[in-house]
């Protein structure tokens, strides 16, 4: 259960060599350090006892700091060690401001001194020094400057390798790379809601578990109102106010312990805020919400029998009001199970640096950039347009942190965004019928006034019938001879003539007679 960035830090400090013997020796040292210094939550009492017995002890743990204005001092909280209100100097807090922003993982020099009192209370735990394992400061301006030295493709590969993927490996083509980047958008866009359903072992939860300490991976059925939103007794805001992203793993099982969590989640997914009786009133949060799960059937089979939300928990899988708040449906079935060759051995950003980069990008926004070059089609309603803009914004943040991009870049991301939101809308149409009839998503180039429609790869019918509005005089129908059924395309055009009917395209007298009878019927009844 050791976070990846903790391992990276220790390995980098002991195994930075090409000498195989020294690497093996370094790995053994890392194992010893973790065994002696890394704190598992169940060992908290033992660690406190060691501090008392030895007077001083060095640990690897997550530390956060809060200000106590009544006493005009700072208190440190050591998470896994379950140490509350440890003494810490103002200078240490000033040197590491992220201690006040949710905390950081660090190597912590602790001391136990039973003579330290505040008023009549004893506060024996003291933080003497910390050596951050995560970055305690981060400069986004340097990222923007360094980005200029990379092409777009080079930067994309760097991002993917930093996340652990090898973009040049078999099976990770351009399409899959774009989908893997989409997994990062909830980490750079606040209050972004996404669903990914797909096969097992395709890394759906990996990003949120291993790549960033700012995401919470929640097992199915563990979500409670107090844990997610607010504790009415204490007034403490829950996970939506503490994390950048919350990923519900195995969302095909039960999602929430409390039945009233669903309406609260609807409110939160819509506006980023919620209200609940008791303390707090209207409460806001910034956490993005991700629902991951497995599909146990081919997607074609699911679409034949139901809809693509059907594998999700029965709490929400037919709730159109809930599902309409999903910004993007990532087609996880396109991402196959990863082989060892799909994981990179090349250089990328260290995990702590990469997680800070993703967190820093949340402050930017490119929400309006679509309007510089394109208009959205008439079928996109408010929630559709909002979702599409946020997906485009996320891709620009990831691939163009310096803010330099072209119209072609925006169009590329816009097509992906329209597809991801259209997939949501198509399932809503299957569930809710004509309330969600407007699914022909398109965009209009402001320069050429050309309208481009975006379809879904899994909708096989698009190969037979155009997935765009048909031209006047064109329609499709089904016909059969009793044994076979086929699709026919009918085109009607008006051309100058002499008023006589001419039938072409068939030698069947029966068909010709049927057409003549139809024409005569229309003439007789047209008035």
Q: Locations of the language-model features?
A:
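Extended, charged/polar low-complexity intrinsically disordered regions
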Residues: 1-166
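Helical mechanochemical/support elements of P-loop NTPase systems and associated helical scaffolds
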Residues: 151, 155, 257, 261, ...
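Conserved, well-folded catalytic cores of nucleic-acid-processing
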Residues: 162-166, 268-272, 295, 329-333, ...
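Conserved ASCE/P-loop NTPase catalytic core
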Residues: 166-301, 306-310, 321-324, 444-458
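Flexible glycine-/small-residue-rich
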Residues: 249-250, 291-293, 330-332, 491-496, ...
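Phosphate-sensing "switch" segment of ASCE/P-loop ATPases
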Residues: 281-289, 294-399
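C-terminal helical "lid" subdomain and adjoining coupling/linker elements of P-loop NTPases
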Residues: 340-342, 368-443, 450-467
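Conserved P-loop NTPase/AAA+ ATPase motor core
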Residues: 456-527
């Amino acid at each position: 259960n050791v976070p990846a960035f903790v391992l990276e830090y220790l390995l980098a400090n002991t195994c930075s060599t090409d000498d195989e013997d020294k690497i093996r020796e370094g790995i053994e040292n890392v194992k010893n350090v973790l065994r002696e210094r890394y704190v598992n939550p169940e060992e908290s009492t033992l660690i406190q006892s060691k501090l008392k017995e030895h007077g001083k002890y060095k640990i690897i743990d997550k530390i956060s700091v809060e200000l106590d204005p009544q006493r005009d001092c700072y208190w440190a909280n050591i998470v896994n060690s379950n140490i509350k209100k440890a003494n810490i100097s103002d200078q240490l807090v000033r040197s590491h401001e992220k201690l006040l922003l949710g905390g950081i993982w660090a190597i912590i020099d602790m001391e136990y001194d039973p003579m330290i009192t505040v008023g009549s209370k004893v506060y024996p735990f003291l933080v003497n020094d910390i050596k951050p394992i995560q970055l305690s400061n981060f400069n986004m301006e340097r990222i923007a400057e360094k980005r200029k030295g990379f092409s777009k493709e080079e930067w994309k590969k760097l991002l993917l390798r930093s996340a652990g993927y090898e973009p040049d490996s078999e099976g990770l083509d351009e399409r899959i790379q774009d989908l893997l980047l989409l997994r990062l958008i909830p980490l750079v866009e606040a209050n972004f809601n996404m669903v990914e359903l797909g096969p097992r072992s395709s890394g759906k939860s990996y990003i949120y578990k291993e790549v960033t300490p700012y995401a919470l991976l929640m097992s199915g059925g563990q979500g409670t109102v107090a844990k997610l939103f607010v504790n009415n007794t204490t007034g403490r805001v829950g996970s939506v106010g503490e994390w950048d992203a919350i990923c519900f793993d195995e969302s095909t099982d039960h999602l929430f312990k409390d039945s009233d969590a669903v309406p609260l989640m609807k409110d939160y997914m819509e506006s980023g805020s919620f209200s609940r009786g008791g303390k707090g009133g209207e409460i806001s949060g910034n956490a993005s919400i991700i629902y991951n799960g497995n599909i146990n059937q081919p997607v074609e089979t699911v679409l034949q029998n139901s809809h693509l939300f059907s594998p999700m928990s029965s709490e929400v899988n037919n709730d159109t009001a809930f599902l309409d708040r999903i910004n993007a449906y990532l087609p996880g079935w396109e991402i196959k199970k990863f082989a060892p060759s799909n994981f990179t051995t090349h250089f990328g950003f260290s995990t702590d640096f990469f997680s800070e980069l993703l967190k820093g990008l949340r402050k930017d926004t490119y929400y309006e950039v679509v309007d510089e070059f394109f208009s959205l089609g008439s079928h996109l309603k408010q929630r559709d347009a909002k979702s599409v803009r946020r997906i485009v914004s996320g891709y620009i943040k990831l691939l163009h942190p310096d803010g330099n991009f072209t119209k072609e870049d925006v169009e590329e991301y816009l097509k992906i965004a329209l597809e991801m939101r259209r997939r949501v809308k198509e399932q809503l149409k299957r569930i809710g019928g004509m309330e969600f009839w407007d699914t022909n998503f398109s965009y209009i180039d402001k320069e050429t006034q050309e309208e481009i429609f975006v379809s879904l790869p899994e909708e096989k019918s698009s190969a037979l019938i155009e997935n765009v509005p048909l031209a006047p005089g064109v329609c499709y129908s089904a016909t059969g001879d009793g044994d076979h059924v086929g699709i026919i395309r009918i085109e009607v055009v008006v051309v100058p003539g002499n008023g006589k009917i001419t039938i072409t395209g068939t030698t069947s007298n029966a068909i010709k007679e049927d057409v003549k009878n139809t024409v005569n019927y229309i003439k007789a009844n047209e008035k």
